[in-house]
Swiss-Prot record:
GO terms for cellular component: endoplasmic reticulum membrane. Residues 396-417 have a biased composition (Basic and acidic residues). E3 UFM1-protein ligase that mediates ufmylation of target proteins. It comes from Aedes aegypti. This is E3 UFM1-protein ligase 1 homolog. GO terms for biological process: protein K69-linked ufmylation; regulation of proteasomal ubiquitin-dependent protein catabolic process; response to endoplasmic reticulum stress. Residues 396-470 are annotated as: Disordered.
Length: 777
């Protein structure tokens, strides 16, 4: 190992000697490469190859070349450019640059660049020159100019050379701003001059634009120079307000308030005041101010309003508040002021419409006629039936159907029970001999149920079925109320308030009219119930009489031959059967609130009543109408008639034979009385044969004139030959008279003969006595 090291030393010495030798004997390039390669292999020599591999250099030599290049480039060099210039790999250059920075503190490595102190000093001189020219400089601008970080420039250049090379001052509020004292002095003078010339509130932005001063510098200096005014804030929209202007504002506000007792917000805002209400409060601390929307009023004006209100209440008149308040006050301001001024007692005695205050006593005197109108209309609605219809619709709308049916059914059952008791203890075969028919347990149709309704919608249940429109009745209109009010307000010049007052009083009078209508309705209902009971009893008697008449007439019809009976039955049902059916239909129509005008009903009218009536009447009434025209016998009709009476809760009285004999006797006397007063030949003959038939058979007969010949044929056995001849001749003359009406000569002759025979015919009928007993029994 020692021998090797000695050999290396010898070779190195030879190599050095050869290099220093001036001799022409030099090593060849190949030998040099071999020697260097051997040294590198042995670790005795460290070299750096160039990028093209043709040259190599040592680490120290590369460091020296980097320093030399930094100097040549003026103290700032980029490593990328340096690597190209030195023809050395970038990584090698970067490592050497880092080594140089470590060895020399004056050299800085920033963003891939090497910078030395000479560069810093040169930049500092440039910054100082620029600062002297502009008066102000920002590190951010230097960053853009020199392409270096702001913090690096600030710490290594600006602050390092401040007051050495860079003659300036750092801004206390912004460390990146530097300015010269002369610049500050000039700016302060500009600001002082501009503010001194301002006499009204001016935006700070306008001042800055005029002076050309940054807002930052203005905010820093304004407190030092603004001795004649103040800046509202440091925001972009700030204003400068001179003290002279603020004094003018305060003087104007105080003087105006002292003279008028109020302040308009728009006028105060026009003085440049932003927060008007606080400004007024601050400038008038001792005054009791009420802030409204458009203005602020003082105690003096409020006292004036209160005094006027008290005078108005004491005199029972009205007050237009706008006449004592400033014209600039809006309706909203007036409402707000009155709500503060009016006490609870005052509010009960007044009505307020806009700016007009009316006392209730003043309005009551004017509106008195409306009470009479409401009562009159209520009476008219009850008399016309419109109120009853309204109550029925209202009940149908709000009451549950099951409750309505059960309630109505119970009411109907009570009425039937009352009628049965009355009939059972009343006239015409009543008492223990009365025949009571069973009534069907059916629900009655829904009608007004007038005893269970209220005069106010508020009392109706709200849980009823909904759908459709609610029942409505208007007993008094706003126009009628307004007309009355207008007549009373017109002398005072307040007719414009009539419609508003009418709207205010309409619910009151509408409720009053409904209450009055309900009161009258209850009275009429009580009277109607009494009349209904009386009518029901009288109709029951009338229908019983018709029923008995038809039954008694049937006995007379049964005495005739079978071929004649159908004609007589048809005529009896068409006349008395129709009367019976009409009476039943009239009753049902009244019970179901159906329209049935007139004293008689046609077939169509009866059928219409059947279709529209309640279900409990429909089947019985339909069968009755059909039986009038289609019954084969009187018994069939009487069965249907009995069912109809039962459906109408009427009692069919028990047959009384003694009463039947009295009825037949009365019927005969009635016919005799008609005969005595009759002069028409055809009617004389008709009455005569009916009287003779009644006397012969002790039965009644209901027949028309066309049945006289059949009755005469039936009576032939009961008549003497002379009587039969006389009646036959009289009958023939009547037929001739009816057929010879066109020939006046024949009519006169026949009429003369009839006049001669009429007394004889009347005598036969009035003096006739039966020769034997022929009875329907």
């Amino acid at each position: 190992m020692t021998s090797d090291w000695d050999e290396i030393k010898r070779l190195a010495a030879d190599f050095q000697k050869a290099q220093l030798s001036t001799s022409l004997q030099r090593l060849s390039e190949r030998n040099c490469v071999e020697v260097v390669s051997l040294l590198i292999e042995k670790g005795l020599l460290e070299v750096i190859f160039t990028t093209d591999g043709k040259e190599y250099l040592t680490q120290a030599h590369l460091a020296q070349e980097v320093k030399d290049e930094l100097f040549v480039q003026g103290g700032r060099v980029n490593l990328v450019d340096l690597a190209k210039t030195l023809n050395v790999d970038f990584d090698r250059v970067q490592r050497v640059a880092e080594q140089v920075v470590q060895e020399d503190p004056s050299v800085k490595f920033v963003l891939g660049q090497l910078l030395d102190v000479s560069y810093f000093e040169r930049v500092a001189m440039e910054v100082n020159e620029k600062l002297a020219q502009a008066g102000e400089i920002n590190v951010a601008d230097l960053t853009m100019q020199y392409d270096l970080p702001a913090d690096f420039i600030l710490s290594n250049i600006v602050l390092k050379y401040l007051n050495k090379i860079i003659m300036g001052k750092q801004d206390a509020s912004n460390a990146n701003i530097f300015f010269t004292q002369s610049y500050v002095t000039r700016s302060k003078a500009k600001i002082r001059g501009a503010l001194a010339a301002i006499t009204k509130p001016t935006p700070v932005s306008a001042i800055l634009a005029q002076c050309g001063i940054p807002d930052r510098l203005f905010n820093m200096l304004v407190n030092e120079v603004a001795t004649l005014g103040s800046v509202t804030s440091r925001s972009p929209g700030a204003q400068y307000i001179p003290h002279i202007y603020r004094k003018t504002q305060v003087d104007w506000v105080q003087n105006f308030y002292r003279q008028n007792g109020y302040l308009e917000h728009d006028s105060v805002a026009g003085l440049g005041v932003t927060d008007v209400k606080n400004f007024i409060t601050n400038q008038l601390p001792e005054a009791k101010i009420i802030h409204l929307k458009k203005c602020s009023v003082g105690e003096k004006l409020i006292d004036q309003v209160v005094a006027s209100l008290e005078e108005c209440l004491s005199s029972n008149t009205y007050l237009d508040v706008s006449t004592i308040l400033p014209s600039i006050m809006t309706d909203e301001d007036i409402d707000q002021l009155l709500s503060m001024v009016l006490t609870a007692a005052m509010q009960k005695q007044t009505l307020i419409f806009g700016s007009t205050i009316l006392t209730t006593k003043f309005v009551d005197d004017i509106i008195k006629p409306c009470y009479g109108i409401a009562e009159e209309h209520a009476k008219r609605s009850v008399d016309s039936g419109s109120y009853q219809q309204y109550m029925a619709e209202k009940l149908m709308k709000h009451q549950d159907p099951m409750d309505r049916d059960s309630a109505v059914g119970e009411g109907k059952a009570d009425k039937r029970e009352e009628r049965r008791k009355k009939a059972a203890g009343g006239k015409g075969g009543g008492g223990t001999q009365g025949r009571e028919t069973k009534t069907k347990s059916t629900k009655k149709h829904v009608r007004g149920q007038k005893g269970n309704v209220s005069d106010s919608d508020d009392d109706m249940p709200s849980g009823g079925k909904k759908g459709g429109k609610d029942a409505v009745i208007e007993l008094i209109t706003t126009k009628e109320i307004a007309k009355v009010l207008e007549a009373g307000l017109e002398p005072e010049g307040l007719e414009d308030l009539s419609k508003q007052l009418a709207q205010h009083y309409y619910p009151q009078f509408s409720k009053l009219a409904l209450a009055k209508a309900h009161q009258l309705y209850e009275i009429s209902l009580h009277q109607s119930n009494q009349n209904r009971r009386q009518t029901h009893a009288s109709l029951q008697d009338k229908l019983n009489n018709l029923y008995n008449d038809i039954r008694l007439y049937e006995k007379g019809i049964k005495l005739f031959p079978a071929d004649v009976q159908p004609q007589l039955v048809k005529y009896l049902l068409k006349s008395l059967g129709t009367d019976f059916s009409n009476e039943i239909c009239f009753y049902v129509a009244a019970e179901c609130n159906l329209n049935s005008n007139g004293t008689t009903l046609t077939v169509e009218q009866r059928n219409k009543i059947v279709q529209e009536c309640s279900q409990e009447y429909k089947s019985a009434l339909q069968a009755l109408n059909k039986a009038v025209f289609s019954s084969a016998s009187i018994d069939d009709f009487l069965d249907v008639a009995e069912s109809a009476l039962q459906a109408c809760s009427m009692i069919l009285k028990k047959i009384d034979k003694k009463k039947d004999r009295n009825l037949i006797l009365c019927h005969k006397h009635g016919l005799l009385e008609q005969l005595a007063n009759c002069s028409d030949p055809a009617l004389v003959l008709h009455l005569a044969v009916l009287i003779i038939f009644t006397i012969c058979t002790q039965s009644m007969l209901h027949a028309s004139g066309r049945h006289v010949s059949s009755i005469l044929s039936f009576l032939q056995p009961q008549l003497s030959p002379e009587q039969a001849q006389t009646l036959t001749s009289y009958h023939d003359l009547v037929l001739k008279l009816l057929s010879a009406e066109g020939s006046s000569s024949n009519v006169d002759d026949i009429t003369k003969q009839l006049e001669d025979l009429t007394p004889t015919v009347k005598s036969i009928a009035s003096s006739f006595k039966k020769s034997g007993v022929t009875s329907a029994e």
